[in-house]
C-alpha cells in the first residue's frame, strides 16, 4: 500500500488536514466518542502530525507502557548486560492477575528474558512484565523513557489485577510520547539508522509487535492485508491501542489512540476501530 502524499494536522480543528486546503474531519468521531480520547498520528516524513488531539495530555498508560520496558530490554541486549537466554527469578510481588502465559507461575520460578518480553508484548502478560520491571528496575526503565524524549510518561508501579482508584493513574503517558517512541523504532528499522536503539534492535522490536495477539482496535479498522505492529492497553474504563501501520511499506505511519473515562468500555473497540478506519482511508485517498 503506497502512501507517499502526506496530511497535516490540527488539534484545534480536530481534523486531518491534507495539503491543498482539503480537510478530512474526525471531529464527529471525537465528539460522539463515549469518553475521552487522545490521538497522535504521523508518517516518517519530517512533517507535523497528521492528527493531534489531546496529544500532550496525560492518560493512564495501562499496558501500553510496556513498550518502553521492551526498549529497556533491547538496550540491555546491545550493551551485553543481558541476553534473551538469561534467566530471571520471579519474586512474590511479581505474581498477579492478567497473565495468559505465566498464569500458573509462582515465585521462585526462573524464566528466560526473551520469553518474558514476548509474553509481555504479544500477550500483555502482567507477571512477565512485573518480572522485567523487578529485574531491570524503575530507575533504568524511567531513564529509558526520558532518553527517548517521552516527557509526559512515568512508570511508577508494578502491574496488578485489582488497582485501588487512587493508584490507577500512577503509570501515565501521552499520545505524543508513545507516537515519538514508535516513530523512533520504525525509523530505525525502516531507514537502518540508530535512533532509540540500533537498527537491528528496532527491527526486532517491530517483529515482536507484529506478533500481537489482541487485534480488536486499530487492526480491526485497517484492511486485513496490511501488517500492523501494535500494543494495546486496558483498565476498567480504558481501552487504548498504539501501532506502526504497514511497517514494511514505502510509507508506514504511526497511530496512537489513548482513552479514559469510558462510559461503555465494551463498545470502545468498535469506536477505536472507526478512528483507525477513517484515518487510514484518508491516507490512502490522498495517495491516489
Language model regions located:
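Structured C-terminal helix/loop/strand segments within mature extracytoplasmic catalytic/sensor domains
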Residues: 5, 22-28, 33, 50, ...
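Beta-lactamase-like hydrolase cores
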Residues: 18-60
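Conserved catalytic neighborhood of penicillin-recognizing serine enzymes
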Residues: 95-130, 138, 171
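N-terminal export signals
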Residues: 2-21
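Mid-domain, small-residue-enriched loop/turn segments at the edges of structured enzyme/sensor domains
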Residues: 36, 130-190
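Extracytoplasmic
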Residues: 34-36, 54-56, 62-64, 83-85, ...
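Active-site SXXK
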Residues: 60-88, 120, 255
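Active-site helix/loop module of the DD-peptidase/beta-lactamase fold
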Residues: 81-111, 140-160
Amino acid at each position: 500500500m503506497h502512501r507517499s502524499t502526506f496530511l497535516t494536522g490540527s488539534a484545534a480543528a480536530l481534523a486531518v488536514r491534507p495539503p491543498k486546503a482539503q480537510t478530512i474531519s474526525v471531529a464527529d468521531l471525537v465528539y460522539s466518542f463515549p469518553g475521552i480520547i487522545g490521538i497522535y498520528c504521523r508518517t516518517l516524513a519530517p512533517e507535523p502530525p497528521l492528527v493531534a488531539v489531546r496529544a500532550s495530555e496525560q492518560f493512564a498508560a495501562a499496558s501500553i507502557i510496556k513498550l518502553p520496558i521492551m526498549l529497556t530490554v533491547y538496550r540491555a541486549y546491545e550493551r551485553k548486560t543481558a541476553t534473551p537466554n538469561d534467566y530471571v527469578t520471579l519474586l512474590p510481588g511479581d505474581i498477579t492477575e492478567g497473565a495468559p502465559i505465566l498464569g500458573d507461575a509462582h515465585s521462585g520460578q526462573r524464566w528466560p528474558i526473551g520469553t518474558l518480553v514476548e509474553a509481555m508484548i504479544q500477550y500483555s502478560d502482567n507477571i512477565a512484565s512485573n518480572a522485567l520491571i523487578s529485574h531491570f528496575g524503575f530507575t533504568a526503565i524511567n531513564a529509558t523513557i526520558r532518553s527517548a524524549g517521552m516527557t509526559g510518561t512515568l512508570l511508577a508501579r508494578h502491574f496488578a489485577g485489582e488497582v485501588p482508584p487512587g493508584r490507577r493513574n500512577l503509570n501515565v503517558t501521552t499520545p505524543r510520547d508513545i507516537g515519538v517512541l514508535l516513530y523512533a523504532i520504525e525509523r530505525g528499522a525502516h531507514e537502518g539508522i540508530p535512533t532509540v536503539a540500533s537498527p537491528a534492535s528496532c527491527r526486532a522490536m517491530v517483529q515482536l509487535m507484529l506478533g500481537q495477539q489482541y487485534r480488536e482496535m486499530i487492526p480491526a479498522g485497517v484492511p486485513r492485508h496490511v501488517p500492523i505492529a501494535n500494543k494495546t492497553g486496558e483498565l476498567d474504563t480504558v481501552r487504548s491501542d498504539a501501532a506502526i501501520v504497514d511497517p514494511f511499506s514505502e510509507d508506514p505511519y504511526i497511530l496512537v489512540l489513548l482513552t479514559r473515562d469510558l462510559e461503555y468500555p465494551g463498545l470502545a473497540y468498535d469506536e477505536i476501530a472507526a478512528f483507525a478506519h477513517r484515518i487510514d482511508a484518508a491516507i490512502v485517498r490522498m495517495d491516489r
